Amino acid sequence: MTDFGDFVRRRRERLRATDKTFSVRQLARRVDVQPSYLSKVERGEVAPPSEVTIVRIAKELDVDADVLLALAGKVSSDLQAVIRRRPELFGELIRQLRGMPDRAVLRLVREVRDGDW
């Protein structure tokens, strides 16, 4: 089982405990894949789906798409475009952030977002 598939299965089952529309069959229909394929994804028998399908699954499961993409070993296409424009800077930025506590990273993100830099 993959981290991606396991996460999707656990999240879907948690939601299904209170909402029966989260069966494999019904979720598969809403994200436009075959139920057998989604079942195989959950069991880790096939590779995670495309970015488009992962984003649909994330929306249905009320999970941040970047979290599911990361679990699938993928990076969203919008982030890929940003990284390709400045690969050295982003590589170094990520390496520097690696050792920082989450609270410090969040503070830095807020400062950049709010223009306080």
Region spans (language model):
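A short, Lys/Arg-rich alpha-helix, primarily the initiator
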Residues: M1-K20, R107
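DNA major-groove recognition helix of helix-turn-helix
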Residues: R12, E42, T53, L61, ...
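Short alpha-helical DNA-recognition segment
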Residues: A17-K40, A70
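Short, solvent-exposed alpha-helical "recognition" segments
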Residues: A17-T18, E45-S50, S76-D78
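DNA major-groove recognition helix of helix-turn-helix/homeodomain DNA-binding modules
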Residues: D32, E51-V67
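Amphipathic alpha-helical "recognition" segments
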Residues: P35, E51, L68-A81
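Interfacial/linker helices and their anchor residues that mediate assembly or domain coupling
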Residues: G73-W117
